[in-house]
Amino acid sequence: TEIEALIGRMPGLPIPAEAETLLRRDIHARLLALQKMHPKYEGIGQMIQTAEQAIGQVKPESEERLLETARLEQFSRLSKEISWLLKEERLLTPVSDSVREQLMTKLEFRRVETAYHHHIRQAERLIKGQQLHQAQWYCSQMKTLLEPWSHSNKQAAGWYQEVLKLCKRVSSGLKGEAQSKGSSSN
C-alpha cells in the first residue's frame, strides 16, 4: 500500500517515531477493516498479527541530521507526504486535531533542522574554497528558512544568529574580493 511504501522509505531518515507509529496503526486499521469486509480473505489473520507486532517494534527516530543532498531531498519529500496525509485526513486511524498539529509542526521543524545542517555545512565548505558567491546563496536559503521559526523557537533563533554571522563573513569576503579586483585593475 501507499502507507507501507512510505514506511519503507523511512530507515535512516529523521522521521519522528510518532509518525511511523501512526502510519503502522493505520495499516493495522486498514487490515481490520478488510477483515470485516472479507472475513475469509486468505492470510488476513497473519497480516493483522504482523501489523500489530510492527507497531510495537517502531525504533526511535534516527538522530542523523547531517544528510547528503539526495537524502535531504528524499527526507523532505517523505515528510511532506506524511504531512499531507495528516492535513487531508487520509488516514483510517483517528487523529485528534492537537496531535495532527503537533506532528505536522514536528515534521516541518525537522525539515528546517536538517536543511539548516546541510546548508551550513555546504556554506562553510564553499567559504573555505573561496567560492563566496555560492556560499552567499546558501546563506540566503538559510535566512529564508529560519527567519519564520526564529521568533518562536529558541533553537531556530540561535541558528538564525549563527547564519547572520556567517552571512556577514561571506559579505565581508565578497567586499574584500571586489576591492582587490578594483585595485588590481588600476
Where are these regions (language model features)?
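N-terminal topogenic membrane-targeting module
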Residues: 1-70
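Hydrophobic/aromatic side-chain positions at a characteristic register within alpha-helices
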Residues: 7, 67-70, 74, 115, ...
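Helix-turn-helix repeat elements of alpha-solenoid scaffolds
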Residues: 16-26, 90-98, 139-140
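Inward-facing hydrophobic residues that define packing positions of alpha-helical scaffold repeats
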Residues: 24-27, 79-82, 86, 127, ...
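TPR/TPR-like alpha-solenoid helical repeat scaffolds
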Residues: 44-59, 98-109, 152-177
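Short, charge-rich, low-complexity alpha-helical interaction segments
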Residues: 70-103
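Soluble C-terminal extramembrane regulatory/interaction domains of multi-pass membrane proteins
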Residues: 90-134
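Alpha-helical oligomerization segments
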Residues: 119, 123-186
